[in-house]
Swiss-Prot record:
EC nos: 1.1.1.267
Binding residue positions for NADPH: 5-8, 31-33, 121, 123, 214
Protein family according to the UniProt entry: Belongs to the DXR family.
Species of provenance: Prochlorococcus marinus subsp. pastoris (strain CCMP1986 / NIES-2087 / MED4)
Name of the protein described by the UniProt record: 1-deoxy-D-xylulose 5-phosphate reductoisomerase
Entries under InterPro entries matching the protein: DXP_reductoisomerase (IPR003821), DXP_reductoisomerase_C (IPR013644), DXP_reductoisomerase_N (IPR013512), DXPR_C (IPR026877), DXPR_C_sf (IPR036169), NAD(P)-bd_dom_sf (IPR036291)
Named cofactor requirement(s): Mg(2+); Mn(2+)
Length: 404
């Protein structure tokens, strides 16, 4: 479990606790939260753990020693230690819950080691899909989505003819698939007027009406960048053209996504808005394990509604489509610029409406430098460049015309 102390990590370990006869934890990694990591070690007794912040390694080792467990785990520290955990020999599946592009290198380590990937870190494919997909083919690893929308698409696609589930991660468009319809809750501001967005606070933007998620992804949901990034991810996972991937605002978050077939038939996957279900399916596929979770009840829901996203209200959505169509290194630049802009918003250095402004400026500055056939080192280089560029532009205090 990469990112065991984050939102995806804690929910994954809850699943393991509920189904101890189905899963065993052998390796955990975290960024800085050594107290929670220590609790997880006490409960799950992995073979190895790693903390990214090496300054906390001594404290973590002391915590583990104080547990007094009979077979304590190997304790590692530093970024390279995270890669070691990702490729740990006794693991057969790696759940990637590290937020942002920081999860790219560990995910690549797991792929090269031949592990099956339950991908909750969408930035890995968005920034480096052109590198990740060939690596999956070479290693024979299988990638399954652990986020709700792409899990929904994956589940629906299994109803298509002549579709080999094991070849899911090849990025080849399945037989009979015409279009993908991604649903979006609309985020924290779906009922706000555009003119009111200038008054958005960090607290406003990190309060999601439907889902329990981390702060960064909750802000991405509010800007609809999360859905824009998922468009790019869907393109790489399922081979669908950007013109055939559509977004619909669905406030109830009951239909998690839909696929449209060549004969105009539509398949949808429904369920309560709970991240544990797609995580479990990515871990259990192709089996379905019995749970005691709340059963689905359509009459309790009452109604399902949909509407087209407002492009003025959600400029990040258009930026994501444009970056995806540019291809090459542009999606990596978009992703890095977004991560940095959201980080600066959370630190109250910029306003909510400035997030797409700085992303747009960064992408514009990269237009004449796009590498259409990047290697991994090229992806990492532009990722670093975009982060620095956003920081420098914010320091200048410049204001740009809103891309909306």
């Amino acid at each position: 479990m990469l990112g065991s102390t984050g939102s995806i990590g804690t929910q994954t370990l809850e699943i393991v606790s509920e189904l101890p006869d189905k899963f065993k934890v052998v390796a955990l990694s975290a960024g800085r939260n050594i107290d929670l990591l220590t609790e997880q070690v006490s409960q799950h007794k992995p073979e190895v753990i790693a903390i990214e912040d090496e300054n906390l390694l001594t404290d973590l080792k002391n915590n583990i020693n104080n547990l007094g467990i009979s077979n304590p785990p190997i304790v590692l520290g530093g970024r390279e230690a995270i890669n070691s955990v990702a490729a740990w020999d006794s693991a057969d599946t790696v759940i990637t819950g590290i937020v942002g592009c920081a999860g790219l290198i560990p995910t690549m380590s797991a792929i090269k080691a031949g592990k099956n990937i339950a991908l909750a870190n969408k930035e890995t494919l968005i920034a480096a899909g052109s590198v990740v997909i060939p690596a999956l083919k070479e290693s024979k690893s299988r990638l399954l989505p652990a986020d709700s929308e792409h899990s929904a698409i994956f589940q629906c696609i299994q109803g298509l003819p002549n579709y080999e589930n094991a070849d899911f991660s090849t990025g080849q468009i399945p037989n009979g698939l015409k279009a993908i319809h991604l649903t979006a809750s609309g985020g924290a501001f779906r009922d706000w007027e555009v003119e009111d967005l200038k008054n958005v606070t960090v607290e406003d933007a990190t309060s999601h009406p439907n889902w329990s998620m981390g702060r960064k992804i909750t802000v991405d949901s509010a800007t609809l960048m999360n859905k824009g990034l998922e468009v790019i991810e869907a393109h790489y996972l399922f081979g669908t053209s950007y013109e055939n991937i559509e977004i619909a605002i669905h406030p109830q978050s009951i239909i998690h996504s839909m696929i449209e077939m060549e004969d105009s038939s539509v398949l949808a996957q429904l369920g309560w808005p709970d991240m544990k279900l797609p995580i479990l399916y990515a871990m259990s596929w192709p089996e379905r394990f019995k749970t005691n979770w709340k059963r689905f009840n359509l009459t309790e829901i009452g109604q399902l509604t949909f509407k087209k996203p407002d492009e003025v209200k959600y400029p990040c959505m258009g930026l994501a489509y444009s970056a995806g169509k540019c291809s090459g290194t542009m999606p990596a630049v978009l992703n890095a610029a977004n991560e940095m802009a959201v980080d600066q918003f959370l630190k109250e250095k910029i306003s909510f409406q400035e997030i797409p402004i700085f992303i747009n400026k960064t992408c514009e500055s990269h237009l004449n430098k796009i590498n259409l056939n990047p290697k991994l080192e090229d992806i990492l280089e532009v990722d670093n460049w975009a982060r620095i560029f956003v920081q420098e532009e914010i320091k200048k205090g410049k204001k740009y015309i809103n891309v909306g």
